[in-house]
Every structure is written in structure tokens, then in C-alpha cells.
Curated annotation (Swiss-Prot):
Reaction equation(s) it catalyzes: L-glutamine + H2O = L-glutamate + NH4(+)
Enzyme class: hydrolase
Organism: Natranaerobius thermophilus (strain ATCC BAA-1301 / DSM 18059 / JW/NM-WN-LF)
Gene: glsA
Keyword Hydrolase applies: yes
PANTHER family: GLUTAMINASE
Protein name, per record: Glutaminase
Stored HAMAP family: Glutaminase
Domain of life: Bacteria
UniProt record similarity statement: Belongs to the glutaminase family.
Amino acid sequence: MINNVNQEILRAFVENNRPLAHDGRLPTYIPALMNANKQDFGIHITELDGNSHYYGSFQIPFTVQSISKIITLAMAIMDNGEELVFSRVGMEPTEDKFNSILPLEMSSAYPPNPMINAGAIVVTSLIKGRTAGEQFERILDFTRALADNKNIQVDENAFLSERETGNMNRSLAYYLKDANVINGNVEEILETYFRHCSILVTAEDLSRIAYIFANDGKDIEGKQLIPAKVCKIVRAIMAMSGFYDESGEFAVRVGIPAKSGVGGGIIGVVPGYMGIGLYGPALNNKGTSIVGFNVLEELTSYLQVGIY
């Protein structure tokens, strides 16, 4: 790493890109997300030595949405082993949209990767638990442990909104069930899926979760929360597929493992250096925080930390 980061540097990057929020949009297909303030933006960085840097609205809670997929992927591998998980879902990037059924129809019905919705539904079905409630409590507890925040909860309004309007996800799940890719009760699997996408986090929480993945699964005290090999797998999947059909552009412009969510969050991992959490609800036409994408591009260029 060539340059050090500080609050003034972060302020400059954020304020330089904040006007882009005017051109962003809020997602209309999840009504609960339409109440966000497009001008909000926050960033939080946790370095491996424990030092933190932050600016803006880094403590505003928002729903984690698809960023939860990296947590459930790690759990599914820890619960079942990578061989079983990747016998149900692939590792390959795709040019299709995150909620497209086309990859399932064009192949053997197995989702190409765990980051698209179909793949994440398969991964969710593999989380251990006697009931959907027990499954979700394990996911919530694990999220709290990774973020070192026992107060993380679910946004019940967002959950109900997603459950009510999630017909595309429902169609994906029933397609997967019909093809024998997933086992169990479809509605219970979707209940768990919608709930873990509705977990409330902050940019600070994301930065602390990213820290774990940057530190090969260890927390600040050295406790191994995720096996190092699992972290490596998740980072690789993030790098290839974390931004769906925008992943290639993100790799070129930003160049670190990261995952976006339509709630406006981005989690970024700089292996061996830092975890990054960002929140900016104004989205570009691919469903990524428009300010967050550009701030990360400037930040990684300044720090010279791109993995490529």
C-alpha cells in the first residue's frame, strides 16, 4: 500500500462524487426501499491493525439485501463442505441480470454462481436448521458475530414488502424445486431468504464484516470465525460475480473483491489490508450505488490496492 487514508481524504472522495446521486434512482420493485434519501452517503474503513476511518452517514441503518449472500455462502460451505455446495451451484460469472431465469433454462437448471438470486436461494436452502426460523436465527447470529454488533436486527417492513412483491424470486425457487436442485419447502426457504436480505446494517457493520474476509476469517482478537479457505473462495466469487452483469467493469475500474446490494450498500475487501463498507441508496442502471462505485474507484486508485 503506497498511500495512507484519513478522514480528509474520504471527505474529498465523497463530496467530489456526491452530486452523482442526482442521476441515481431508488428501486421501485421493493416498495420499502423507496423511502431512502438519495443524498445520504457514508463510508467506513477498518484496517487490519484495528484502526478505523469514516465519513458521512456511516451509521445510518439500511437493509443488507444481496450483500447477505456472501454470509450465507460462507455458512453453507462451513455447514456442508465446498464439494456439496458447488455440486448444486456453479462458480462461473454470468452476463445475465441478478434475477434472470435464463441461465437456469439454458443449462442444467443449476445456477451458474451463488451471487445471482437463483444461486443464493440454493445456498440458503443448504443452511443447517430444523426449521426456517432456526435457519434464520443462525444466519442472524453469524452476521452479528462477523460485525461484532449484537444489536443487528431485521427490518420487518422490508421483509414483508419483499415477501409480498417477490414473485420473480418465487418463480426461480419453484423452478429450482421442480428441477430437484433444492430440497425442502419452497416457501420456508424463501422466508429465510427474504429475511436475511432484510437484515439492517450500517456501513460500519459492513466494514467490520469485510475485515473478517480481509483477515482470512479472523476477528480483531485473532479468533477464527471463518476458515481461511472459505474466505478465499468467497473473495474469489465476489471478484467474479459480486456485481452481476457489471462485475467486469467493476474489476477493471475498482479491482477488489466486493458485493453490492440494491439497498445501497457495498462491501469491499482488500485482502491483508482492510475492509470497506459504503452506503449510498441512489443506484445506477445496474442496481449499484452510483456514488459508492465511484468513491471506491477513486479510493482504490489512491491507495493502489487493486488485486489485479
